[in-house]
Amino acid sequence: MPRSVWKGPFVDGYLLKKAEKSHEGGRKQAIKTWSRRSTIMPQFVGLTFQVHNGNKFVPVLVTEDMVGHKLGEFSPSRTYYGHAADKKAKRR
């Protein structure tokens, strides 16, 4: 179920402030964040975020296609090892 339209997208306030500072200063330094739940805004395009995945920080370069998605979508928190092979079939 999507978020109500009247509420608008959720973004942590400090992320907006850091993005504005980064644009004003012209710095290309990555913005470190634990806020995987924040929505990517148009102001974030071209910036690099380091999004925490529970273990380490994953660098995410924001492009126009990512606007409207969440930061956590681009920083996988689980490792997929594939399905276990059938031991009986393997032995034959």
Curated annotation (Swiss-Prot):
Residues 73-92 are annotated as: Disordered. GO terms for biological process: ribosomal small subunit assembly; translation. It holds the Pfam family Ribosomal_S19. Keywords: Ribonucleoprotein, Ribosomal protein, RNA-binding, rRNA-binding. The keyword Ribosomal protein applies. The keyword Protease does not apply. GO terms for cellular component: cytoplasm; small ribosomal subunit. GO terms for molecular function: rRNA binding; structural constituent of ribosome. It comes from the Bacteria. Belongs to the universal ribosomal protein uS19 family. Protein S19 forms a complex with S13 that binds strongly to the 16S ribosomal RNA. PANTHER family: RIBOSOMAL PROTEIN S19P FAMILY MEMBER, SMALL RIBOSOMAL SUBUNIT PROTEIN US19M. This is Small ribosomal subunit protein uS19. It comes from Maricaulis maris (strain MCS10).
